[in-house]
C-alpha cells in the first residue's frame, strides 16, 4: 500500500458528491494522488535547485503544480 491513508481519500470523494465509496476506489485515487504528488515534488526540487536553494518552498510547489497541468 502507498503512503496516503485511504480514510481521508474517501472523505475527499464524498465531498465531491459520492454517497458511498468502495475501498478499491479509495485505493485507486490514493495511488493517482501519490503519483501526481511525486511528479509535482520532483519538479519543485528542480525549481529550488535552479534558484540555488536546498529548501523546497510553497511557491516551488505551486509553480510545479501549474506546470503539471
Swiss-Prot record:
Feature type site, description Interaction with DNA: 14
Subcellular location: Cytoplasm; Chromosome
GO terms classed as biological process: DNA topological change
Alphabetical UniProt keywords: Chromosome, Cytoplasm, DNA-binding
Induction (free text): Expressed at constant, high levels during exponential growth and during stationary phase.
Gene3D superfamilies: Histone, subunit A (1.10.20.10)
One GO term describing the cellular component: cytoplasm
CDD domains xref list: HFD_archaea_histone-like
Interaction with DNA as annotated region, ranges: 20-22, 54-57
Domain of life, per lineage: Archaea
Keyword DNA-binding set for record: yes
Entry-linked InterPro entries: Archaeal_histone_HMF (IPR050947), CBFA_NFYB_domain (IPR003958), Histone-fold (IPR009072), HmfB-like (IPR050004)
One example GO MF annotation: protein homodimerization activity
Keyword Cytoplasm: yes
Spans traversing the lipid bilayer: none
UniProt similarity note: Belongs to the archaeal histone HMF family.
PANTHER family referenced in this protein's UniProt entry, alphabetically: ARCHAEAL HISTONE A
Subunit structure: Homodimer and heterodimer of HmfA and HmfB. Forms primarily homodimers during exponential phase, and heterodimers appear when cells enter stationary phase. Dimers then assemble into higher oligomers, with the DNA wrapped around the protein core.
Function: Binds and compacts DNA (95 to 150 base pairs) to form nucleosome-like structures that contain positive DNA supercoils. Increases the resistance of DNA to thermal denaturation.
Protein name stated in the entry: DNA-binding protein HMf-1
Phylogenetic classification of the source organism: Archaea, Methanobacteriati, Methanobacteriota, Methanomada group, Methanobacteria
Gene name of the encoded protein: hmfA
Amino acid at each position: 500500500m502507498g503512503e496516503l491513508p485511504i480514510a481521508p481519500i474517501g472523505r475527499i470523494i464524498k465531498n465531491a458528491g459520492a454517497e458511498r465509496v468502495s475501498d478499491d476506489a479509495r485505493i485507486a485515487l490514493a495511488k493517482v494522488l501519490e503519483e501526481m504528488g511525486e511528479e509535482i515534488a520532483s519538479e519543485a526540487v528542480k525549481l529550488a535547485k535552479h534558484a540555488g536553494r536546498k529548501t523546497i518552498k510553497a511557491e516551488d510547489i505551486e509553480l510545479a503544480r501549474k506546470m503539471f497541468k
